[in-house]
Amino acid sequence: MNAVTDLKHDYLVADIKLADWGRKEIAIAETEMPGLMAIRDEFAASQPLKGARIAGSLHMTIQTAVLIETLKALGADVRWASCNIFSTQDHAAAAIAATGTPVFAFKGESLQEYWDFTHRIFEWADGGTPNMILDDGGDATLLLHLGAKAEKDVSVLAHPGSEEETFLFAAIKEKLAKDATFYSRNLDAIKGVTEETTTGVHRLYQMAQRGELRFPAINVNDSVTKSKFDNLYGCRESLVDGIKRATDVMIAGKVAIVAGYGDVGKGSAQALRALSAQVWVTEIDPICALQAAMEGYRVVTMDYAAEHGDIFVTCTGNYHVITHDHMAKMKDQAIVCNIGHFDNEIDIASVEKYQWEEIKPQVDHVIFPDGKKIIILAKGRLVNLGCATGHPSYVMSSSFANQTIAQIELWTEAVKGSNKYPVGVYTLPKHLDEKVARLQLKKLNAQLTELTDQQAAYIGVSKEGPYKADHYRY
């Protein structure tokens, strides 16, 4: 165990003495998070999350600290772990732990520690269970569902398909040996989950299609004020921040390969082009490929790009987008990184047999048998959080305002005993999306034009909104 913990307290962080530093940065972040702070002010008196016990699995950053304190200000009880072994900002974790909120996170966790910490968010000090999940990537949701399956048939854990699954399955077996009904007991208590990111949402839809999902879920990722802002504008700033901090390379003139041209890929490509890289895009989807081509990017295959690129960024949410053979073809000193949620976009396992030389934390040379070296950042995990500090506070305010509203929506309906959200996956209604945008605009001194009665009638909308149909593509 690398982290320092006080066993008298219900937390595990790197160094609790970092709390004062974290508190100062949290105060700055609050000034850059208008949407989230406005929601805190609006609902503090009514306490809509009173009674909610939220198990949170999301990057433990300064911005997440503001989210946690907003949830608490609205009445929730919270336990927290990071959803990535490299993404924790240790001073942020310390600042939250110092307030009495249980936090289990430090930068550079092992996979064994990661799954231990994810279990800890379900282990309430009073022996009870959480009743809500706030998830990023779906690991907390997966843990309960898979664990409950294993209670009935442990053979579901017999064949791990990756290093990650090896540690996950071992953690579940260890827990079952101590508490045979841990997962089903927690699963039965959960009223709903709000999911932050594309990868986690994909998991939720798959579970729902298979009839395995056990509670309602709100897909926060597909709120316009999340996906079109966090995914695009957030990545546009944080990708290059991570690459620069890790390598100090000049980006201008280099050939940068962006794998995937969704919202994350669009932001990543814009960032690299803004620094005068020659940006090439790989895509499977002809619509996204056409968008990239119309923006002036060269659209190629990874097989072709591998030997030409200087910088490679995966943004797909898919599996083995960069393979061993691709890396074997790359130039000496090519930089390889990922800004999708999981580390399997790059086939890291296939190059673990070679010599690795750590340059500094989260920056490694992989040395091939012929002596060629490539630079892998954050061991294939999120480069913007592994090698930098993630997205700026302002854009995370939009995402976390949506998360808070979604938690309120699911919890208040559960308390009322309504049937508004039977088991399934939902998105927030348009008027709440627009509300988040209005709250964010105030910080930018933007002035909205107001429709006249005639104009509203002409286009068939209310003067107060929503202004677009659900099928509108922003």
Swiss-Prot record:
Pfam families in the record: AdoHcyase, AdoHcyase_NAD
GO cellular component, one term: cytosol
Compartment(s) of residence: Cytoplasm
Substrates-to-products reaction catalysed: S-adenosyl-L-homocysteine + H2O = L-homocysteine + adenosine
Note describing how the cofactor binds: Binds 1 NAD(+) per subunit.
Location, primary (coarse class): cytoplasm
GO terms for MF: adenosylhomocysteinase activity
Pathway this chain belongs to: Amino-acid biosynthesis; L-homocysteine biosynthesis; L-homocysteine from S-adenosyl-L-homocysteine: step 1/1
E.C. code: 3.13.2.1
One BP annotation, GO: L-homocysteine biosynthetic process
Cytoplasm is among the record's keywords: yes
Cofactors that this protein relies on: NAD(+)
UniProt xrefs under InterPro entries: Adenosylhomocyst_ase-like_sf, Adenosylhomocysteinase-like, Ado_hCys_hydrolase_NAD-bd, NAD(P)-bd_dom_sf, S-Ado-L-homoCys_hydrolase_CS
UniProt: substrate binding residues: T61, D136, E196, K226, D230
Residues where NAD(+) binds: 197-199, 231, 260-265, 283, 318, 339-341, 384
Swiss-Prot/TrEMBL keywords: Cytoplasm, Hydrolase, NAD, One-carbon metabolism
Function: May play a key role in the regulation of the intracellular concentration of adenosylhomocysteine.
Entries under PANTHER family matching the protein: ADENOSYLHOMOCYSTEINASE
Family indicated by similarity: Belongs to the adenosylhomocysteinase family.
Alphabetical list of HAMAP family matching this protein: AdoHcyase
Protein name, UniProt field: Adenosylhomocysteinase
Protein's organism: Ralstonia pickettii (strain 12J)
Species lineage: Bacteria, Pseudomonadati, Pseudomonadota, Betaproteobacteria, Burkholderiales
Designated gene of the protein: ahcY
